[in-house]
Amino acid sequence: MVIKPRLKGGLALTNHPIGAKEFVKRQIDYVKSQDKYEGPKKVLIIGSSSGYGLATRISLAFGAGAETIGVAFEKGVEGKRAGSAGWWNTIAFNEAAKKEGLVSKNFIGDAFSMEMKDDVIKFIKEEFGGKIDLLIYSLASAVRTDPIDGVTYRSALKSTTKDITGPTINFEKEVMEETTMGVATPDEIKSTVKVMGGEDWKLWIEALDKGGVLSEGFKTVAYSYLGPKVTYGIYKEGTIGAAKRDLEHTSDVLNDFLKEKYNGEAYVSLSKALMTKASAVIPIFPLYAALLYKVMKEKGIHEGTIEQKHRLLTQMVYGNNPVIDEERRLRPDNWEMREDVQAEVEALWDKVTPDNFKEISDYAGAREEFMQLNGFDFDNVDYDADVDLEELAKLKP
């Protein structure tokens, strides 16, 4: 069948398997064009199939020669449904890793469950050398079932103070439109913290510690985002902000524990604003990202997902140039948050309208990045060619 892009707002309803392979290849090519670095040898990535988690896995495997385990919730071919983008990203990563002689193992399922934790620990003990050096926590999910009380919680993208109305980009209609984010109830705030906070990260570390599979000097990093003033209503003062504060508190608790027992470390890393499957559906964010891209590209400091994560790993987590703020957070968003960058973005924000947003922002770049997340808009992929889903269905991550 021929697969064409279908969108609904900030969601892609279709994904292109051949495009996904190109998406992964380009990131691998970037890492291979850079110097190799001394990093961890055995890595577990929770949320490994797209965005920040996938880029991290690519950097560690192809830049530092790490053996990797990825955990992700993705779907394969079902009838005429071509499977999720993350499914194909994972298969493409596997194929490339195998060619380089790199060990790559994937667990597809619910990362929040204790069964998944048990399965991963069993594999580490029996087939992965018995220990891991690094855990990256890069999970984006709207739903979590607490494995302890069995209750299913759903996150809510809402304000915690007042209704927030602001402009955003609708990629489906290619228009800038107003969007309103309502105020969360106390239960919605609690549920968002349960899904997007630090509880599951902590459960993973506790399970791995109990299983005896953490190495001396073990590190763990969870990915987060803060952003500038224009996004504070959503992030800092929203339900996401409450969850991220919980994540930061968890980082401190884990750091104390790991330092004492393993001479290890735990950090939250604040990422640069980028189009990911998670961020594309957040109100206001796509417009901010499009304006930011324009400013950062003009200054020659724009980074895509792979460049950002490669710099984080080579310079900060495993390098000599960590940028750490007073709250003990790694700050690879430091170029985005530069005063000159933010001043120019704010000036554009004040000028942007539904009529001029494509001209005064890097809308084209932001949209291309969004489409490429789902395997579309690559100039060397034939999107009119027939895709044999029956053959592709035989491939497994």
Regions found by a protein language model. Name each.
Residues 65-105, 110:
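Glycine-rich phosphate-binding loop and adjoining beta1-alpha1-beta2 segment
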Residues 155-262, 270-293:
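Catalytic loop of short-chain dehydrogenase/reductase
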Residues 1-38, 186-190:
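Class I SAM-dependent methyltransferase Rossmann-like catalytic core
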Residues 253, 264-269, 286-393:
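C-terminal helical subdomain
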Residues 109-120:
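The beta1-alpha1 cofactor-binding region of Rossmann-like NAD(H)/NADP(H)-dependent oxidoreductases
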Residues 29, 34-73, 77:
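Canonical Rossmann dinucleotide-binding motif of NAD(H)/NADP(H)-dependent dehydrogenases/reductases
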Residues 46, 132-141, 152, 168, ...:
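Rossmann-fold scaffold of SDR-type NAD(P)-dependent oxidoreductases
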Residues 105, 119-149:
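A glycine-rich helix->loop->beta "capping" turn
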